[in-house]
């Protein structure tokens, strides 16, 4: 239910911000006709996120998963109940005004906050509260993508730090329920459709895929270092941190003016890439510009998920 409400809110803000329409229908910022005014929209969204973080909770900044891990490791899995509504609202504003993020990080953070809050109300042990936090977080991911197995693996690797029946069973049940919710609210279709007649890979193709995996692994390390460098650069600015998301939003708007496909969630970009309908020039442009927009915006400390943009890149 929370996942569906978040998607509705993102679509509503996207329609209002880029098309002046009070509608909850599916919308992408890529088809806007705002011209140079498109630079202002993400900046205004970033400004609102900064205000929410300043007056609400600084914990809404970031993409959700590291923040959940931090609470598990340092705060006995206790997350402020206010994050339950502040995180999805701030993320919807960020994404709906053109932020190059996905909805998976915010829903993971929101589900984790719901589980943690329930655990605090029930007065259970820290370990049981950790399981509830992980169950809520991964149920959220399963609800967005309809991929319970991937969500369970995420919980084991990033949130539970263990593989035992006492934690695996409740998390698995939560993920299955989240997946059922996905099919109920979003339909039976897959999130990213592909051609059914994919040919078997040749030996040369398998070698290329292996090489590509190594290259992407190296680039992943470089990406992490670049984002950290951008975060450090923002910390050196002579302005309060609440202004950083607005500054990052200006960069997002400038990039979005030249390549509108970089704006918003961009699930349609992944679908187009899988179908092979984009030219090489568009693919290279999207990869480079989406990375610049995402890295600067994330480094500015705004709110949004990273999985969808990284899948695109």
Regions found by a protein language model. Give the residues of each.
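Alpha-helical transmembrane segments and immediately membrane-proximal extracytoplasmic
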Residues: 1-313
């Amino acid at each position: 239910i929370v996942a569906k409400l978040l998607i509705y809110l993102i679509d509503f803000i996207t329609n209002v911000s880029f098309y002046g329409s009070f509608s909850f229908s599916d919308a992408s910022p890529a088809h806007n006709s705002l011209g140079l005014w498109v630079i202002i929209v993400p900046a205004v969204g970033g400004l609102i996120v900064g205000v929410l973080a300043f007056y609400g909770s600084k914990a809404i900044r970031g993409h959700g998963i590291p923040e959940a891990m931090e609470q598990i490791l340092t705060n006995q899995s206790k997350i402020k109940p206010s994050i339950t509504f502040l995180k999805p609202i701030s993320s919807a504003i960020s994404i709906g005004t053109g932020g190059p993020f996905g909805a998976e990080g915010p829903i993971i953070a929101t589900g984790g906050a719901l589980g943690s809050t329930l655990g605090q109300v029930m007065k259970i042990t820290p370990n049981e509260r950790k399981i509830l936090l992980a169950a809520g977080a991964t149920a959220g991911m399963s609800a967005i993508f309809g991929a319970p197995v991937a969500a369970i693996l995420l919980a084991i690797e990033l949130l539970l730090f263990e593989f035992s029946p006492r934690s695996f069973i409740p998390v698995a049940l939560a993920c299955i329920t989240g997946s059922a919710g996905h099919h109920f609210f979003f339909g039976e279709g897959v999130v990213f459709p592909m051609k059914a007649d994919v040919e078997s890979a040749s030996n040369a193709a398998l070698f290329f895929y292996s090489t590509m995996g190594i290259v992407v692994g190296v680039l992943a390390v470089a990406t992490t270092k670049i984002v950290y460098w951008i975060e450090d650069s923002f910390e050196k600015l002579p302005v309060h941190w609440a202004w950083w998301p607005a500054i990052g939003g200006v960069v997002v708007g400038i990039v979005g003016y030249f390549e509108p496909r970089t704006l918003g969630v961009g699930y349609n970009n992944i679908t187009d890439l899988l179908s092979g309908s984009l030219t090489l020039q568009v693919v290279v442009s999207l990869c480079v510009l989406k990375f610049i927009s995402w890295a600067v915006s994330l480094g500015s400390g705004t709110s949004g998920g990273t999985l969808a943009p990284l899948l695109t890149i």
